Amino acid sequence: MSNQEYTFQTEINQLLDLMIHSMYSNKEIFLRELISNASDALDKLNYLMLTDEKLKGLKITPSIHLSFDSQKKTLTIKDNGIGMDKNDLIEHLGTIAKSGTKSFLSALSGDKKKDSALIGQFGVGFYSAFMVAGKIVVQTKKVTSEQAYAWVSDGKGKFEINECIKDEQGTEITLFLKDEDANFASRWEIDSIVKKYSEHIPFPIFLTYTDTKMEGEGDHKKEVKEEKCEQINQASALWKMNKSELKDKDYKEFYKSFAHDNSEPLSYIHNKVEGSLEYTTLFYIPSVAPFDMFRVDYKSGVKLYVKRVFITDDDKELLPSYLRFIKGVIDSEDLPLNVSREILQQNKILANIRSASVKKILGEIEKLSKDNENYHKFYEPFGKVLKEGLYGDFENKEKLLELLRFYSKDKEKLISLKEYKENLKENQKSIYYLLGENLDLLKASPILEKYAQKGYDVLLLSDEIDAFVMPSVNEYDKMPFRDASHSESLKELGLEEINDEVKNQFKDLIKAFEENLKDEIKGVELSSHLTSAVALIGDEQNAMMANLMRQMGQNMPESKKTLELNPNHAILQKLLKCEDKEQMSAFIWLLYDGAKLLEKGALKDAKSFNERLNSVLLKAL
């Protein structure tokens, strides 16, 4: 059959160009990526052999074999895992799922060391081989298929797929190394890389090499070559080993291989439980957020094993979604080996493991929180996700509230709720918060003025998730939460009502505001909670809905709002005496525009605002 030629997805061409010309400061990681892929293929075959009736009689010894030819400058990585068919080759080696490449390319910083750390996270580990290889040949046969296929590419925009002969299922990747990277076709180089990155891959890795030794004596000495095959890794599932046998370095190197992440984890939790339930967990808190953390189709970072046999790496129920940044392993002794996805979702054993695991992880995060500098490294990438737990995890809500940090009116740095309570003023009855689109607008909000007079601090919440979760949080340490913009909260400040005399005094001015702004607002009210601000756009009824829609990525339909005026402000006192209708109209619009700026940070009609401002300035000069 003739070769079929295909073109790489556009983003892959960009990626390959990046890999080949400018990417890695540590090229050796390509081998870690290929070995990790081989291990995944073996895991998947093991699972199929448990669940697919047709494969239950299949007998294999799962392993990974490495070999090289220093003369021909080739390096081969071979596994007897699940293998691929033609469609798999096109999908996995011609495109990148989940738009990973686009996210990858946009995340690059230009710093080679930082950029190289991103490579495995974005599911592009295979392509890293083009950093050292001028050509790659992949021969593969899927376990459920009779036909084998070869994939060939030089990484320059195209690849070929053709039928080939291969007896055993699995995948064999041959790299034709570039001259400057021929050192990777070396026994000691390969051995060193495997021990560094893949020591605890749970399958044996064998290296085939030619050993040369001298035999005979004197003039009869001669060089004898012997081909040898040695296992070069421990092939022990690290999580099943005793903690006393492991060093910090062991955990960190395993993480890099397991999570495809060059950066070191912030922390790890290794736990073995014996008794009515027997299971082992090893969880890592990364230092870098997964690229797909805020995508609906995010990939779970936790693998489930039963008695060291891989079951799934795609079950989002293993941990709650607000802990989706966690990487690691759950290995149960009690679950049945042929457990199905449906059984997993309703399994009491797994529910107990999940509940205990969440408590362990939150306990570890609490330890990190004792050191502000360390906690900042955690909270900056993961704080927003952690907040999601307030909405669904009622069992751990109190613990989560302790772990959250907030900006506030009075503090420049993030504070805990405990710190907020420690600074409460006498007679303060609630924890006040204000929701908005960004921190700068919140800090400038006129709503804060009366709270400042009372000395009350206000939490400033600008994350999209805040509007979604705050209504579900009633109190912290027996103190209620209150939205600072709500009338209930303002009543707690003990503000005086606007008396009838003042209302009567401003009656005509309010009418003038309503006439000029009839297409913009639903009404005008005098407010007693403004101090230095002249006006404020208030919308207590719709504010929460607008924030919720923003959190869901939708825009709230434009609705008319109430304009609140400060009757004590000097500008309004002077406007009471203004008899020039045209000038008054310009002033009214400028005050409204100013209130809009404080609310939104921008104006819909900047041109008209500029014209009005120029007109007022001209008359004033």
From Swiss-Prot:
Entry keyword annotation includes Chaperone: yes
Organism: Helicobacter acinonychis (strain Sheeba)
Family per similarity comment: Belongs to the heat shock protein 90 family.
UniProt xrefs under CDD domains: HATPase_Hsp90-like (cd16927)
Location of region: A: 1-341
Protein name as catalogued: Chaperone protein HtpG
SUPFAM superfamilies hit by this protein: ATPase domain of HSP90 chaperone/DNA topoisomerase II/histidine kinase, HSP90 C-terminal domain, Ribosomal protein S5 domain 2-like
Superkingdom assignment: Bacteria
Chief location bin: cytoplasm
Gene field: htpG
UniProt GO molecular function: ATP binding; ATP hydrolysis activity; ATP-dependent protein folding chaperone; unfolded protein binding
